[in-house]
């Protein structure tokens, strides 16, 4: 059984980009779909989709490259099952002075730090992307 599916997702993306893969496939969950949606909205991936039936559902993420280089230079897990990191709306981090994003899980769903600030929401900091 997988201990931390979010870390697994981020590692799969990082490894796929290291070998310049076009797509990366992983087991699907609602949280992973929400994270993929934020990555797409912020322009870090081209697209994502679901494949398979309900028992073997897969999430397929199409990675984005610019002039042969990955658009994501760093993707790092912040909160983990052993140490969850929560920030209030006033404490939300700015990643790389606003050039990157933090993905936050709030009571209103998973969103970027910019959107959480706009809505006045705090929550669990899942990961940093730049």
UniProtKB/Swiss-Prot annotation:
What processes in GO biological process is this protein linked to?
Answer: translation
Q: Which GO terms describe its molecular function?
A: rRNA binding; structural constituent of ribosome
Example GO CC term: the record gives:
ribonucleoprotein complex
What keywords tag this UniProt record? Ribonucleoprotein, Ribosomal protein, RNA-binding, rRNA-binding
Q: Which residues form a coiled coil?
A: none
Q: Which domain of life is it from?
A: Bacteria
The cross-references to Pfam families, in alphabetical order and at most eight, read:
Ribosomal_S8
Per its UniProt record, what InterPro entries does this chain match? Ribosomal_uS8 (IPR000630), Ribosomal_uS8_CS (IPR047863), Ribosomal_uS8_sf (IPR035987)
Give yes or no: UniProt keyword Ribosomal protein.
yes
What role does it play? One of the primary rRNA binding proteins, it binds directly to 16S rRNA central domain where it helps coordinate assembly of the platform of the 30S subunit.
Q: Provide the assembly information.
A: Part of the 30S ribosomal subunit. Contacts proteins S5 and S12.
Family, as annotated = Belongs to the universal ribosomal protein uS8 family.
Q: Which NCBIfam families match?
A: PRK00136.1
| HAMAP family in alphabetical order | Ribosomal_uS8_B
Q: What is this protein called?
A: Small ribosomal subunit protein uS8
């Amino acid at each position: 059984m997988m201990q931390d599916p979010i870390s697994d997702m981020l590692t799969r993306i990082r490894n796929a980009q290291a070998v310049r893969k076009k797509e990366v496939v992983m087991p699907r969950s609602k949280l992973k779909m929400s994270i993929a949606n934020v990555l797409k909205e912020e322009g870090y991936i081209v697209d994502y989709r679901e494949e398979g039936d309900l028992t073997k559902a897969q999430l397929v993420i199409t990675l984005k490259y610019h002039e042969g280089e990955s658009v994501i230079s760093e993707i790092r897990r912040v909160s983990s099952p052993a140490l969850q990191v929560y920030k209030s709306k006033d404490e939300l981090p700015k990643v790389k002075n606003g050039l990157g994003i933090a993905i936050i899980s709030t009571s209103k769903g998973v969103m970027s730090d910019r959107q959480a600030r706009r809505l006045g929401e705090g929550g669990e900091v899942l990961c940093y992307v730049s």
